[in-house]
Amino acid sequence: MSLFPALRPIDNDLYVEVILQEDVPVVETSGHRPPEDLLELLKAAGVKTMHKCVSVRHALSAQEAGVDAVTLFGSEGGGHIGEYGLSTMILAPRAADALEVPILAAGGIADGRGLLAALALGADGVTIGTRLLVTEECPIHQNLKEALAAATELDTLPILGSLHNTLRAWKNPAALKVAELESSQADMREILALVAGTETKRMYQHGEVDAGVIACSQSIGIISETKPVYAVIDGMVREAAMIRDRLAA
């Protein structure tokens, strides 16, 4: 379960109530610092907590707040990448040197090469997102899966920087229009209309790939086919082990 900041008001207390009722084992929060009142409720119930952030400074705050692990999210990643422009290659070793809790590296990781690189940089594990979009189990429309599988590493762009909420998204007509509106200092309401969840729903539910905005990592350039989730995870582990053995030979 994930608790993320959003552009619209969200009652996280209701989410926590359901989390506790359903015995969710792990919860990830995101942002500058995890909400300590929610952390207390979760930890008292035995729920493991993780916090996703885009800087070591925020990771240290999360550690101080009492989370069990921290995810460092590099600017290659798909989604809200912050305003620092720091890559996973920099964040992972910095966090490994600075933190005592386990760290996960995220952003731009989609195969065994990325997994092994993250471990070499000091991470205890990785988080993957975009790779799981292009899987058999992912419930997005087949049109969108095929479009993402055909994309390259050049087919993403950061948007919403004008709202101080930078998001790396797939470069479709809707995302390009958002970038155009931002550069012309258009009314914020025009921008928000394009990134509304109702527009994104047209994309992932009905296959209208030109509508809406969807988070997408630069790792899309190394994703070329739809696979079962098991095959993705197993393939990553096997590839990482094979490269490790080759380097050790």
Question: Model-predicted segments: where are they?
Answer:
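Acidic, glycine-rich active-site loops and adjacent beta-strand->loop/helix elements
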Residues: 7, 76, 108-109, 131
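Active-site entrance/lid segments in N-terminal catalytic domains of soluble metabolic enzymes
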Residues: 1-98
